[in-house]
């Protein structure tokens, strides 16, 4: 199954010093092709179920990625079903940040991309799966109302 969605909203300003990606860092990720081949997992745990095949920035500057989920594995098949059913509706970008300590201040250094995650509800606003295509099928576009959990009153993570 192929998936496309927003894995990170538009980046922060160049003067930002924090844990989120700056816009220029997102541009570098795309330019250098660093998302290509990054593992796709579920809910910040578990086995790899696929890989990122492409990435781009949309007109708002948000990081988009195209992922291929391996449906020949049990885990990949289940995750694909969760996407089709709206149970896994969001994406999360997993990365580490090298935080430097000096003069009683913290400075965010290099960010290392680790994984893209299919999640029930992402931590960042607007990071949704927007479309998928099962093997041999047509493209299915998702809308925020497709969230299977929306009928339940769920606590915020």
PLM-predicted stretches and their roles:
Residues 1-37, 138-155:
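Polar/acidic, low-complexity leader/linker segments enriched in S/T/G and N/D
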Residues 13-26, 45-51, 70-74:
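Short low-complexity stretches enriched in small and charged residues
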Residues 34-47, 91:
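Short conserved beta-strand and strand-loop elements enriched in small hydrophobics
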Residues 26-28, 40-43, 67-69, 103:
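Intrinsically disordered, low-complexity segments enriched in polar/charged residues with Gly/Pro
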Residues 41-60:
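A glycine-rich, hydrophobic loop/mini-helix early in the fold
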Residues 5, 12, 55-151:
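Residue microenvironments linked to proteolytic maturation
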């Amino acid at each position: 199954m192929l998936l496309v969605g927003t894995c990170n909203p538009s980046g922060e300003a160049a003067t930002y010093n924090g844990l989120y990606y700056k816009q220029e860092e997102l541009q570098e990720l795309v330019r250098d092709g660093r998302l290509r081949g990054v593992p796709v997992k579920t809910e910040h745990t578990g086995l790899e179920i696929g890989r990122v095949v492409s990435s781009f920035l949309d007109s708002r500057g948000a990081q988009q990625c195209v992922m291929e989920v391996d449906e020949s594995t049990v885990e990949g098949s289940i995750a694909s079903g969760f996407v089709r059913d709206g149970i896994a509706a969001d994406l999360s970008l997993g990365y580490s940040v090298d935080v430097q300590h000096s003069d009683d201040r913290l400075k965010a250094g290099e960010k290392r991309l680790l994984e893209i995650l299919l999640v029930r509800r992402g931590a960042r606003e607007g990071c949704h799966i927007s479309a998928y295509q099962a093997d041999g099928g047509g493209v299915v576009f998702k809308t925020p109302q497709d969230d299977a959990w929306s009928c339940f009153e769920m606590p915020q993570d």
